[in-house]
A protein has these predicted regions:
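Terminal amphipathic alpha-helical/low-complexity segments used for targeting or macromolecular assembly
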Residues: 1-88, 92, 133, 166, ...
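Beta-rich strand-turn-strand
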Residues: 171-195
Length: 218
């Protein structure tokens, strides 16, 4: 008997161009327009995503997390020291708050006088670089990790993120993999920046779009 794989979703196009999902008990479906195949999640899980050295550093950083998370709020120097111990490049007078999440310190570079606020999430599977005088407001999310959704094994990708000097990532904003936020730019509250942001521009919305230029008046 033929071996059948688990059900997968097939998209079937109707005469009215509406799209409706149906279940097809095969590992591969071919119709007049598209070919569909299942994700090979087992291969994805077997793939070696981290080196042995990086795995060890992740374990040590997890164990050290309470020293960061439960440090008193004003102890910015202590948190700078702790991040440097794990390979981060941290400039002078950097303020990183204790509820912020730094996923992999050795993939972090922060310029002088930058602030990373409460509950900000720095998911730096790939390198994330902050210039000088950057402000990252509370609950902002910077994601330097994604997957190649065109391949069956769903491989992990780590595109770097760069936040240039004098930029501001506002509350609840999202900056996606591979994005460069230009000098002095502002990513507005809850904006979703999946493309580069021009210097001295202000972007808002989802997807982020430029609303106006930023001017600093002395």
């Amino acid at each position: 008997m033929p071996v059948r794989g688990p059900p997968i979703a097939k998209i079937r196009r109707s005469e009215t161009d509406n799209w409706t999902p149906s279940l097809q008990s095969t590992s591969r479906v071919v119709d007049s327009q598209f070919t569909f195949a299942m994700l090979d999640i087992e291969q994805n899980r077997r793939a070696r995503k981290y080196s042995s050295g990086e795995m060890m550093r992740r374990v040590l950083w997890t164990l050290a997390q309470p020293l960061f998370r439960f440090s008193p709020r004003p102890c910015f120097g202590w948190r700078r020291f702790l991040l440097r111990c794990f390979g981060a490049k941290i400039g002078r007078s950097v303020h990183i708050y204790p509820s912020a999440t730094i996923y992999l310190p050795w993939n972090l570079e922060v310029g002088d006088k930058t602030a990373i606020g409460e509950h900000a999430f720095v998911y730096n599977l790939g390198p994330i670089t902050f210039g000088e005088r950057v402000t990252v407001s509370h609950r902002a999310h910077l994601c330097a990790g994604t997957h190649d959704h065109t391949k069956a094994d769903f491989p992990l990708l780590r595109p770097p993120i760069t936040i240039s000097s004098d930029a501001w990532i506002c509350a609840d904003a999202f900056v996606g993999p591979g994005v460069i936020v230009g000098e002095g730019a502002i990513v507005g509250a809850r904006a979703v920046a999946m493309k580069d942001v021009r210097p001295w521009s202000i972007v808002v919305g989802n997807p982020a779009r430029e609303s106006k230029r930023r001017e600093i008046i002395q």
